[in-house]
Amino acid sequence: MSAVIIDGKAVARRVRENVAREVAEFRDRTGIQPGLATVLVGDDPASAVYVGGKRRACVEAGMADLHQHLPADTSQEKVAALLDDLAADPAVSGILLQLPVPEGLDGAALVGRIPPGKDVDGLTTASVGLLARGLPGLRPCTPSGIIELLDSYDVELSGTPTVVVGRSELVGRPVAALLVGRNATLTICHSRTRDLAAVCRGADVLVVAAGKQAIIGADAVKPGATVIDVGMHRTPQGLRGDVDFEAVREVAGKLTPVPGGVGPMTIAMLLRNTLLAAQAATGTDGPG
């Protein structure tokens, strides 16, 4: 048996096309163009590439690109003041502070200045609290992208034995909360889990966000299970994930590749969040 490969590029493309169509309809209906304010402090090359991709996607979706670039030596107070100005600006639907910020800045405190209604990354304490309580709000992009992939491939979650490997604030914990919200029967594993492979073998859905290359092999996968690989590691052979792809594809029923699986979903869900934020701000629709 060889797994069905989950095509994250195709799913992300469909999400982005739908968002672009809905943005056009929203502008026709309200006269308002959703706007995304990306904030980059400093000149870190990787961060600049990430922000550039988000800005291009924003424009392609018909949204306003409200990018702000500050020098690396900008003070905490000046970055905070900019975020406060963006929070008060009705032209700004969503705010994204690119992390990490330069040394000497408190990234968590800065992110905390973004109001929940404009927190398109879903990272503020308020947004995390809304997610934990199952209340409407903007959800973190990568975790919500994982759910979108599962839905797109008709993976049943309600009552399904599901394991999440990893408990990071960016992926592991929020995707666990989203899965619980979909009534999955959930187990969370981490670095102290005893006999990780045995626990994972009990899962019909396995989400791996451990941050360790090839931590999951064929021995950790139930035959026919759906496996979502969130990891991304640069190696001499190219990008690799937390899952041993070649071994696991012979056991799993469905499997995301790296690259081309979860990765493309992150920007797609960022665009969706920005549209949802704009809709909520006008009372026409919004996060649910």
Swiss-Prot record:
Catalysed reactions, semicolon-separated: (6R)-5,10-methylene-5,6,7,8-tetrahydrofolate + NADP(+) = (6R)-5,10-methenyltetrahydrofolate + NADPH; (6R)-5,10-methenyltetrahydrofolate + H2O = (6R)-10-formyltetrahydrofolate + H(+)
GO MF annotation, one: methenyltetrahydrofolate cyclohydrolase activity
Key words, A-Z: Amino-acid biosynthesis, Histidine biosynthesis, Hydrolase, Methionine biosynthesis, Multifunctional enzyme, NADP, One-carbon metabolism, Oxidoreductase, Purine biosynthesis
Keyword Hydrolase: yes
InterPro entries: Aminoacid_DH-like_N_sf, NAD(P)-bd_dom_sf, THF_DH/CycHdrlase, THF_DH/CycHdrlase_cat_dom, THF_DH/CycHdrlase_CS, THF_DH/CycHdrlase_NAD-bd_dom
E.C. designation(s): 1.5.1.5, 3.5.4.9
Residues reported in the UniProt entry to bind NADP(+): G166, R167, S168, S191
Gene Ontology annotations for the cellular component aspect, listed alphabetically: cytosol
Pathway terms, separated by semicolons: One-carbon metabolism; tetrahydrofolate interconversion
Keyword Transcription regulation attached: no
GO BP terms: L-histidine biosynthetic process; methionine biosynthetic process; purine nucleotide biosynthetic process; tetrahydrofolate interconversion
Biological role stated in the UniProt entry: Catalyzes the oxidation of 5,10-methylenetetrahydrofolate to 5,10-methenyltetrahydrofolate and then the hydrolysis of 5,10-methenyltetrahydrofolate to 10-formyltetrahydrofolate.
Family under the similarity heading: Belongs to the tetrahydrofolate dehydrogenase/cyclohydrolase family.
PANTHER family per record: C-1-TETRAHYDROFOLATE SYNTHASE, CYTOPLASMIC (PTHR48099:SF5), C-1-TETRAHYDROFOLATE SYNTHASE, CYTOPLASMIC-RELATED (PTHR48099)
Assembly description: Homodimer.
The protein, known as: Bifunctional protein FolD 2
Protein source organism: Frankia casuarinae (strain DSM 45818 / CECT 9043 / HFP020203 / CcI3)
Annotated gene: folD2
